[in-house]
């Protein structure tokens, strides 16, 4: 093998993820290179399960749809923790997570306590969610997943996204919509 090929293969970054043990907590703290920088950032990740579980993945996306407004409202609007304050569903090799991302001038330890308070609030929020509100969120997500690409560029981005994430699941939007429509799915994941 030519030397140039060896150099390229040595520099290739491999995607990896680590399935954490149940109820485990890990913190990776890194010092900011500039001591005058007042901003900090926190990524708080809650591992949900295996990315291959399509029904659970659809449930996670529905959770993310429902949680989007309350998370933003609490962290960004009410507590004003920072300009970037969001929660979203994400997948990586072998697992999927619900992740909070907050950039703030506040101490990351304090921000973490506020994220945990939002998680407690979300539990109550979802338990008290009226059937009509739940149905609006479910229908909105189904419509989003069934939406046809508006142009060739958008369709291409969807295909390249399936290639780029290395799952090669070109029909995952359709499967998510079908899963959300199924009543047995709703009975299993939400009752």
Spell out what each predicted region is.
Residues 1-191:
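Mature, solvent-exposed C-terminal subdomains and processed small-chain segments of exported/organellar
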């Amino acid at each position: 093998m030519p030397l140039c090929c060896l150099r390229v293969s040595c520099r290739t970054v491999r995607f990896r993820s680590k399935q954490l043990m149940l109820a485990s907590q890990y913190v990776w703290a890194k010092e900011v290179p500039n001591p005058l920088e007042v901003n900090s950032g926190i990524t708080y990740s809650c591992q949900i399960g295996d990315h291959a579980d399509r029904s659970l993945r659809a449930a996670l996306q529905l959770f993310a749809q429902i949680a989007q407004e309350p998370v933003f409202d609490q962290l960004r609007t009410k507590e004003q923790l920072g300009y970037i304050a969001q929660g979203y569903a994400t997948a990586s090799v072998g697992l999927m997570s619900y992740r909070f991302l907050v950039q703030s001038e506040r101490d990351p330890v304090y921000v973490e306590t506020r994220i945990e308070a939002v998680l407690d609030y979300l539990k109550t929020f979802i338990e008290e969610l009226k059937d009509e509100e739940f149905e609006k969120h479910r229908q909105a997500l189904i419509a989003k997943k069934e939406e046809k690409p508006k142009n060739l560029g958008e369709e291409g981005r969807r295909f390249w996204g399936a290639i780029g994430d290395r799952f090669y699941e070109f029909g995952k939007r359709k499967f998510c919509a079908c899963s959300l429509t199924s009543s047995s799915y709703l009975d299993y994941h939400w009752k």
